[in-house]
């Protein structure tokens, strides 16, 4: 049996991040934690590109444009959707999540989804560090995995 070990070496990786500004006080903290973790994993600061969008529903279109540029090894989506008193929460949570997944599959690029969906601000604040750090690790590990698999596929075709 062949096993591919997880690789968290971010050296030489290019990471794009899209952060929703709605609930920015939480999202901006997540962005800081995420970038710090990427740097700890070896991703050079000049290889991290950040774009912000108004809200979670706009994240997929920005990710799609990052992905279509073919300049990135992985992408990260950061945002916060907090339940209110209307159905809008479900719409935003479901549609942003579906859009993020669609971009990943359509463009064959790993996307770490760090869009929090919580009942209240306190739950979101509690999850800032872990979710943002995990997103950075997921992006690096999956970028390395996809790059390795693509290299092997290319070698098999020769």
UniProtKB/Swiss-Prot annotation:
To which pathway does this protein belong? Answer: Cofactor biosynthesis; riboflavin biosynthesis; riboflavin from 2-hydroxy-3-oxobutyl phosphate and 5-amino-6-(D-ribitylamino)uracil: step 1/2
Can you say what this protein is called? Answer: 6,7-dimethyl-8-ribityllumazine synthase
- Keyword vocabulary terms for this entry: Riboflavin biosynthesis, Transferase
Catalytic activity annotation: (2S)-2-hydroxy-3-oxobutyl phosphate + 5-amino-6-(D-ribitylamino)uracil = 6,7-dimethyl-8-(1-D-ribityl)lumazine + phosphate + 2 H2O + H(+)
EC numbers for this chain: 2.5.1.78
**Gene3D superfamilies given in the database record:** Lumazine/riboflavin synthase (3.40.50.960)
Role played: Catalyzes the formation of 6,7-dimethyl-8-ribityllumazine by condensation of 5-amino-6-(D-ribitylamino)uracil with 3,4-dihydroxy-2-butanone 4-phosphate. This is the penultimate step in the biosynthesis of riboflavin.
- GO function term, MF aspect, one: 6,7-dimethyl-8-ribityllumazine synthase activity
User: Pfam families annotated for this entry?
Assistant: DMRL_synthase
What InterPro entries does the annotation carry? Answer: LS, LS/RS, LS/RS_sf
Which residues hold (2S)-2-hydroxy-3-oxobutyl phosphate? Answer: 85-86, 127
Which EC main class describes this enzyme? Answer: transferase
User: What PANTHER family would the database entry show?
Assistant: 6,7-DIMETHYL-8-RIBITYLLUMAZINE SYNTHASE, 6,7-DIMETHYL-8-RIBITYLLUMAZINE SYNTHASE DMRL SYNTHASE LUMAZINE SYNTHASE
Q: Does the keyword Transferase apply?
A: yes
NCBIfam families with a match to the protein in the record: lumazine-synth
Q: Looking at the keywords, is Transferase present?
A: yes
Q: Which family does it belong to?
A: Belongs to the DMRL synthase family.
Annotated catalytic residues: 88 (proton donor)
Q: What gene makes this protein? A: ribH
Locate the residues binding 5-amino-6-(D-ribitylamino)uracil: 22, 56-58, 80-82, 113
What is the source species?
Answer: Neisseria gonorrhoeae (strain ATCC 700825 / FA 1090)
Name the GO cellular-component terms: cytosol; riboflavin synthase complex
Instruction: Tell me the domain of life.
Output: Bacteria
What's a single GO BP term from this record? riboflavin biosynthetic process
